[in-house]
């Protein structure tokens, strides 16, 4: 790959919304095809491999409930709606904590229950505290226990291989802190060449991680894989490379007897001496040649035994034919 001067990676825009971050980056110039390679690789890793904490286990202590198809006295939403809202709570961990992390909710009505009402241990922060969970009236008195676990991507509740205790409701693990990634390729000009490319990368993330942090993490994951391959190359045992000799098999189509008889004697590829002897005796085609016996050919001037053997061999190899013997 040719070294390209003037290549730049730039942050073109960054916006902070109430519940997410947005950033747009550009990288150019790139050799043709590299923008697709880089953009697609980063997108896949960003969406699938950035880990985080997510609420995955819920238990309604007060009032005591045992499944998601129930209702809660004093709450506008039923348990299913509250669980769906809990899955959208965004958590940031500022210090190392063991997974799972226990969280709690204690809330009396009337009022609105939000993510900010979740009580977290030291080092764990709810980064979207205004996120709506439920509306409570004056009869509501809620106590909920939650567990947040560490993971990546999306893990269905059925795949977590855990048997919850009675009263615990297991949720799907929506771990990925990256909401969406787009990439776009544009053509750019470098000197007289117009086939270079510019990669535009757009990243949307939850408030638990900034796009720049997610991008750095994804790059580290990719580099770790390539470094492993590079370091492993020296340990890979070289296998002997077999030399395969390809033999070309040429099959000539003989054709019908009429076609063969009309072919020129030049197609036998005889030596000049033998060919000239035949031509001087008016032998122009294969048919003319086969009309003569071996004794008749031997009477041709300068046509000796060596020439006869050559004609025999060529007729046999090329057309599967043979000369007639003389009459005894």
UniProtKB/Swiss-Prot annotation:
DNA-dependent RNA polymerase catalyzes the transcription of DNA into RNA using the four ribonucleoside triphosphates as substrates. The gene is rpoA. SMART domains: RPOLD. One of its GO terms (biological process) is DNA-templated transcription. It comes from Fervidobacterium nodosum (strain ATCC 35602 / DSM 5306 / Rt17-B1). Homodimer. The RNAP catalytic core consists of 2 alpha, 1 beta, 1 beta' and 1 omega subunit. When a sigma factor is associated with the core the holoenzyme is formed, which can initiate transcription. GO terms for molecular function: DNA binding; DNA-directed RNA polymerase activity; protein dimerization activity. Residues 1-230 are annotated as: Alpha N-terminal domain (alpha-NTD). Keywords: DNA-directed RNA polymerase, Nucleotidyltransferase, Transcription, Transferase. Its EC number is 2.7.7.6. One of its GO terms (cellular component) is cytoplasm. NCBIfam families: PRK05182.1-2, PRK05182.2-5, rpoA. This is DNA-directed RNA polymerase subunit alpha. The N-terminal domain is essential for RNAP assembly and basal transcription, whereas the C-terminal domain is involved in interaction with transcriptional regulators and with upstream promoter elements.
